[in-house]
């Protein structure tokens, strides 16, 4: 449907955004990225198109371009924890550790503010960043508010953080992670 309308309104950024989201739903990531890119020609400050293009560029290992898009999306929408989270991921994977650290600190603050059950995920990335930067004390401090029974959307991140914290041991990590995950109904 959107494709038919776009033939008549090929410069309409809202239709290009809608088409890009439809393409993502259909698993056509490359086509979606191109659609968002075209939409950004007509609406360069559309934070949603920037976010989705930036997020999907991570999967293409285009970390610098991804970080560029996600940074602008985060600045346009500073209360969106996901923009900061994926900016941190892109920066980490692109070797921009200081920027990644700031992004994950912002993500964590916003997750707490809005009650998002994803603290272990951003804490995991933050811990890895601190370790890369040679800041083990700060990495350890980041783990303080993570507990085995905390609600989370992704039990794998929680298990990794509990491993860093010493709650789970490397010798039986997989078994303990599965047990913890089932106990919390997160698998």
Tell where the protein language model's regions lie, with residue ranges.
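Hydrophobic/aromatic packing residues within the alpha-helices of TPR/SEL1-like helical repeat arrays
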Residues: 2, 36, 63, 70-71, ...
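Canonical positions in the second alpha-helix
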Residues: 5, 38-39, 72-73, 106-107, ...
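Structural marker of alpha-solenoid helical repeat scaffolds
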Residues: 8, 42, 76, 110-114, ...
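Residue-level recognition of tetratricopeptide repeat
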Residues: 21, 55, 89, 128-131
